Regions:
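C-terminal scaffold of the Radical SAM
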Residues: 1-92
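Radical SAM enzyme core and accessory elements
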Residues: 60-144
Length: 144
């Protein structure tokens, strides 16, 4: 079985947009939806359900008409980035070498290097090593 996860996006001219404008409906933020997906994805994967898409496909129509909600062109990347950040945060702050596949460096760093800055603020001193010896979407973490 496969699954696509699409967080709710409020589009202009829809009933949902009216409910949003009337403050009857409050959509999730991108952050809230990404955090929820970090809980949902493992649950589905453990049940043998493959996630084939996270977030709506980027289109000019959605960009023009999105009023509110969890729309981001790189939503899937944001979720994968959260997985990497959460894996590091399970460890106590300190000095670490983090080995990552070249195709996953952007996920490790996060949007606009948010993960790196957050880790620094929390007391993590990390050295990133890019290597093909680590699988895509995975990390190898070594305490220094």
């Amino acid at each position: 079985a496969t699954l696509r996860i699409y967080p709710t996006v409020v589009l202009k001219g829809t009933m949902l947009a009216k409910l949003y404008e009337d403050e009857v409906f409050k959509p999730q933020t991108v952050d809230d939806a990404a955090n929820l997906c970090t809980k949902l994805v493992p649950m589905f994967e453990e049940a043998g359900i493959k996630i084939i898409r996270l977030g709506l496909h980027a289109s000019n129509d959605i960009k023009k008409n999105a009023v509110a909600g969890a729309y981001h062109e790189s939503f899937g990347e944001i979720v994968k980035s959260r997985f990497m950040l959460n894996k590091i945060l399970k460890l106590r702050p300190g000095d670490y070498e983090i080995m990552v596949n070249p195709r996953s460096v952007s996920q490790l760093k996060g949007q606009q290097k948010r993960n790196i800055y957050f880790l620094m603020e929390e007391g993590y001193n990390i050295k990133v090593t890019v290597t093909d010896k680590v699988a895509k979407d995975d990390l190898k973490i070594i305490r220094r």
